[in-house]
Design a protein with these regions (language model features):
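RNase H-like, metal-dependent nuclease domains and their acidic two-metal-ion catalytic environment used
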Residues: 1-63, 69, 73, 86-150
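Short, surface-exposed amphipathic charged segments that create phosphate/polyanion-binding patches used
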Residues: 71-81
Length: 150
């Protein structure tokens, strides 16, 4: 299957207006996303189809166990403790059912796409969002904000 990146890019540009939220930043996986990330960072001018949109702060999230372990562990703990809330989403639940975690030699936990039982993209995107949230808490202002996974 192929993906129409223009549809995804437009969806992201329209999130603020559609949901009444403020996008604080976008974390992305380098694989197949560099062009989109550059467009999101630069923003877009108004045209007959779309209003103008300011650029966003974008940050590559390295897809490595040493980077994603803290977010994966915290998300797992939040789910286990019943502290994780989300909008009803059957596809996200299926992605969680498919996900298989493994540990590297340093006991860093990560979702292993090759060992998973099917699609896990939404879970990985959620882990990336949790990573961004943790980075903001550690290095940015202590803002109260959440994440949306598309």
């Amino acid at each position: 299957r192929t993906i129409d990146y223009a549809v995804v890019e437009d969806y992201v540009f329209n999130i603020e207006a559609k949901y009444g939220v403020t996008v604080m930043g976008l974390g992305f996986d380098r694989m197949n996303c560099l062009s989109s990330a550059q467009k999101w960072e630069n923003g877009r001018e108004a045209n007959e189809f779309h209003p103008a949109s300011a650029g966003y702060t974008v940050c590559e999230v390295k897809q490595h166990s040493s980077v994603l372990h803290p977010a994966t562990k915290w998300l797992s703990e939040m789910i286990t403790d019943g502290k994780f809330a989300y909008e009803a989403n059957d596809l996200l639940e299926i992605n969680f059912e498919n996900a298989r975690c493994t540990f590297d030699t340093n006991l860093n936990r990560y979702v292993n796409k090759k060992r998973s039982a099917g699609k896990v993209d939404m879970v990985v995107a959620l882990i990336n969002a949790v990573h961004m949230l943790q980075q903001n808490a550690l290095f940015g202002e202590a803002l109260e904000w959440g994440a949306i996974v598309i």
